[in-house]
Amino acid sequence: MRRIAVMGAAGRMGKTLVEAVQQRSPASGLTAAIVRPGSTLIGADAGELASLGRIGVSLSGNLEQVADEFDVLIDFTLPDVMLKNLAFCRKAGKAMVIGTTGLTLEQKQLLAEAGKDIPIVFAANFSVGVNLSLKLLDLAARVLGDEADIEIIETHHRHKIDAPSGTALRMGEAIADALGRDLSKVAVYGREGHTGARARDTIGFATVRGGDVVGDHTVLFASEGERLEITHKASSRMTFAKGAVRAALWLEGRAAGLYDMRDVLDLH
């Protein structure tokens, strides 16, 4: 059974990941939990911090110090932190599950390079429902795409720092790929003022931030006389955490490579 470590274990998503690991993989469970260096929480029990009771795993402020205690690292931290962890895991031969969003093209290329040496699952969203939605969007785009105007609307809590969301961008990529378009050339991010008529082949993005919304995504295919909406709404971060743990367990015995949740769920 895979020994799992969680990076950023003191954060909102990190604590949810700790809980998800304990629920899904109690036999081996969480074997390491890492927080930022200098944190006042170093030494605390990860289970107690996640309101689970003691699980015997103390928070560490140094990934290298716990290198012998895990096989796969789940990392949802910010890009700069994640890339440092990626470099370490690549050198140490550790698998990774990465849910970091807001990556640049160059940073994604670093993931691809690391995937030559270690197995990595990278996804903008680990929800089973979202990844099924990507499959549906591919189908809808192939059937309706040339006849419909396509808009992607996403809503998240006030604390989210990147926009559009990684999930919205992944949805846009799925649609653009199905239509043979380059998303970087057809994406329109928000509109203001006298924009003129809508260009036919564009894919629009609208972003809403407020409250404690975990994540809502709607893709609109609007044509003459009808419209199709494909919507996914997440009500709990546990949805993403369970998917990440599923990916971590799936990586056992996998060859080096850069995988995504479509591989984990066999949705290709």
From Swiss-Prot:
Origin species: Pseudomonas fluorescens (strain SBW25)
Any one Gene Ontology cellular component term annotated for this protein: cytosol
NCBIfam families for the chain: dapB
Function: Catalyzes the conversion of 4-hydroxy-tetrahydrodipicolinate (HTPA) to tetrahydrodipicolinate.
Catalytic activity: (S)-2,3,4,5-tetrahydrodipicolinate + NAD(+) + H2O = (2S,4S)-4-hydroxy-2,3,4,5-tetrahydrodipicolinate + NADH + H(+); (S)-2,3,4,5-tetrahydrodipicolinate + NADP(+) + H2O = (2S,4S)-4-hydroxy-2,3,4,5-tetrahydrodipicolinate + NADPH + H(+)
Keyword Transferase: no
Any Pfam family the entry gives: DapB_C
Protein name from the UniProt record: 4-hydroxy-tetrahydrodipicolinate reductase
EC number: 1.17.1.8
Binding-site residues for NADP(+), renumbered to this chain: R36
